[in-house]
Regions:
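A SIS-like phosphosugar-recognition module
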Residues: 1-178
Length: 178
C-alpha cells in the first residue's frame, strides 16, 4: 500500500499480477538466455557492471555465481570503476568476460559510458555481453534480471559439472567459527 499511497502505482496487486503474467511469458527466453550466457562464461571470470541504480542486481549476480557455480565473479558500477578499475584492462591477469546489465531508464551519461567502454573492451580483446533489461515496469525488470542471473549461475555450475546446492566451504567456516 505504501507504493500505491505514494502514487507510484494504482494498486500494488495490479502491478504484482502484471509482473507475474509478464514473467510467465518470458520464462522460456530467460532460461535460454541464461544457458547461453553460462556457456560463454565457462572458463572465464565474470565481471558484472551496471549503473548505480542496478548495483544490487550486479551484486546478486556475483553472489549467485560465487555460491552456485563455486567460482569467482566480481561486480562494480558505472561510473565508479571508470576512475581506476578500467585501467586493469590494459594488463589483464586472467581470463575475464564482462557482463553489462543495461536498463533503458539508465541516465544518458551512463549509456554513453557503456558505449565507450564496450568500444574500449573491443580494443583490448575482452569479451563483453550486454544484457538489456526489459519489462513494462521496474518490478518486472528487476525480477527478470534476478531470474536470469539465477539461471546463469545454475547453468554455469552445470557447465562445471558441479552440484550448485551444497555450500560446503561456508558450512566449514561457520563450524570453525563456533
Amino acid at each position: 500500500n505504501v507504493i500505491a499511497n505514494c502514487g507510484l502505482v494504482a494498486s500494488p496487486n495490479d502491478i504484482v499480477k502484471k509482473t507475474s503474467k509478464e514473467l510467465g511469458l518470458k520464462q522460456k527466453g530467460i532460461e535460454t538466455s541464461g544457458k547461453e550466457l553460462a556457456k560463454k562464461l565457462k572458463g572465464k571470470t565474470p565481471i558484472i557492471y551496471s549503473s548505480q541504480k542496478l548495483l544490487c542486481l550486479s551484486e546478486k549476480w556475483k553472489t549467485d555465481i560465487n555460491e552456485n557455480a563455486k567460482t569467482h565473479a566480481f561486480y562494480n558500477m558505472f561510473s565508479e570503476f571508470n576512475h581506476n578499475e578500467i585501467c586493469s584492462y590494459e594488463n589483464p591477469v586472467g581470463n575475464f568476460h564482462v557482463v553489462i546489465l543495461n536498463d533503458a531508464d539508465d541516465h544518458i551519461r551512463v549509456k554513453k559510458r557503456i558505449d565507450i567502454f564496450k568500444k574500449l573492451l573491443g580494443e583490448y580483446n575482452t569479451p563483453v555481453q550486454e544484457i538489456a533489461i526489459k519489462g513494462d515496469n521496474y518490478l518486472t525488470r528487476l525480477f527478470t534480471t534476478v531470474w536470469m542471473g539465477l539461471y546463469v549461475a545454475y547453468n554455469l555450475a552445470l557447465e562445471y559439472n558441479i552440484d550448485p546446492t551444497p555450500v560446503k566451504i561456508i558450512e566449514s567456516l561457520k563450524k570453525d567459527l563456533k
